[in-house]
Amino acid sequence: MKKTLKILGLTLAVLLGLLIAAAIILPLVFDPNQYKGEIIRLVKEQTGRDLKIEKKIGWSFFPRLGVEAGGLELSNAPGFGKEPFASIDAAGVHVEFLPLLSGKITVDTVYLHGLNLNLAKNAAGKNNWEDIAAKEAGATKPEPEKKEAGKPSLEGLSVGRLDIRRANINWRDASAGSTLAVRNLELSTGKFVSGEPLDLRLGFELARDKAAPIKAALQSRLTASPDALKLAKLDLKVDDSRLTGSMEIRNFASPAVRFDLALDRIDVDRYLTAEKTTGKPAAGGAKSAPAAVAGQPVELPLSTLRSLDVNGKFRIQEMKALGLRSQDARIQLNAKNGLIAFGPNQAKLYGGGYRGETVLDVRGKTPQ
């Protein structure tokens, strides 16, 4: 036992010594600020924009080894004024120390604090990011470099948690005369591993034109892979409403959707009133589809309906919509192979009740 403790203590002492040595040697032999000019030149070359780095790029050594920068600012596209396209108060990447000894890069934390992103479309319909997108699309992909022996490989790269604080995203559409802003966005996640669950926390305030802002907060256990997405222990709060439950999407090419959700209360009229106040549709200026002419049959999107694969339950404890109030609404949806069953559904309405089921069969040529 004493021998084991001695070995453990010696190992910790060696690791601590290596960390202290790195903290002393790295700033002496490598100053990232020497590359400020090169970074600014590359950004100008690749994007056509001017990058400012007002604060020094520095090292961090505790509790993780990392590099940090602050006072970042990227200029706007020509014709969109002096307001910066993006600015960041502080940003950094921290890596785990031990994996570096075996040539692996394990990112512990990526953080972004005080992001301000200004997206805009002018009266002519041109936006302020398409010039960057055009340059990226026209760039030729370099030949893959051959891996050198003993050189750390990005193949072992692992990304840890993401930490975004005090972010603001502003959208201004001069062609439609509308504005949209996501304010005080806070996002934190667990470690990113494809197919493995991670904790997700998201909060923000949404403001559109002159309408009252909407506050939202989300907590969930997220599992994502290239072909599936699952939200477990979902807890979403929007103003005075709270949605809980779970949902899952499998096979993005031909989605299979499963959900089990419960909403405590919602006042739909509150949001409809806000839409009337702004005089604009909730989608941010999109034109609504023309209404069907009375007496004429509505053409159903049969191919889309036949491909539906949905199974889920949705419960609403209290709801107000179009001046009507309902309680304990239970809604079920089951769609598979062209047979769509909406129900059995039920709800309490003004001392009475509703119970019913609707089935749509689109397996044949004529819907039934």
Residue ranges, per PLM feature:
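Contiguous, well-ordered beta-strand patches that form the walls/edges
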Residues: 201-225, 229
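N-terminal type II signal-anchor transmembrane helix
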Residues: 1-48
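Secondary-structure transition motifs
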Residues: 49, 64, 71-189, 250-307
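Short extracytoplasmic
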Residues: 44-71
